[in-house]
Amino acid sequence: MIERSQDEPEAFAELFDRHSAAVHRYVARRLGTQAADDLMADTFAAAFQQRHRYDTGRADARPWLFGIATNLVGRHRRAEARRFRALSRLPAPVDHGQGVAELATARADAFLVGHRLAAALAALPARHRDVLLLIAWAELSYEETARALAVPVGTVRSRLSRARGTLREALGGSDPTVLREAPDHA
């Protein structure tokens, strides 16, 4: 398809139709929906301009596109880190309604974990955050992530391990999806 677009530029539209929603979702989760529209368009514009450099021996263009998107996100990294830091400083909402105690506790715990997670994401080195978010949000495999970032698969594995360790430590060393039981005071 990319090779064909060298002679028939309109053939590139198939690549856009196939992958634009996934690229948009990934960028939206990294930078917000407003920036996602622009960066998704910029990703495909850059891909179109660079299509002569694409390795046509590769069956799937997804890693290449996510690599371009990640590089564009890199230009916005400082704003992304500021956004995560700002989220971590938001005050907890006050719920004046009467709800079930367990629901209120669960919501408060989730809110606090969200703030700690945002702060931890902001504190991650960009190279670790990129690997983590390509795997978690873009749902790329280790191999696809390696191709997207032009690094060996072993580097992806080590960066992911370090990112997960840092997040685990920032979240108190436990899985944030598991509710903590109150100790029995018998």
Model-derived segments and spans:
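Short, charged helix-capping/linker segments at alpha-helix termini
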Residues: Q6-E14, H24-D42, T56
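Internal acidic/polar
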Residues: R83-A110, G114
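Helix-turn-helix DNA-binding module
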Residues: A119-D130, A138-T155, E169
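N-terminal module of bacterial RNA polymerase sigma factors
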Residues: M1-A22, D184-A186
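C-terminal edge and immediately downstream basic/flexible tail or linker adjoining helix-turn-helix-like DNA-binding
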Residues: R85, A119, R147-A148, R164-A186
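Structural recognition of an alpha-helix C-terminal capping motif at a helix-to-coil junction
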Residues: D38-A45, A59-N71
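Arg/Lys-rich amphipathic alpha helix in sigma70-family domain 2
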Residues: Q49-T56, G67-R89, A110, R162
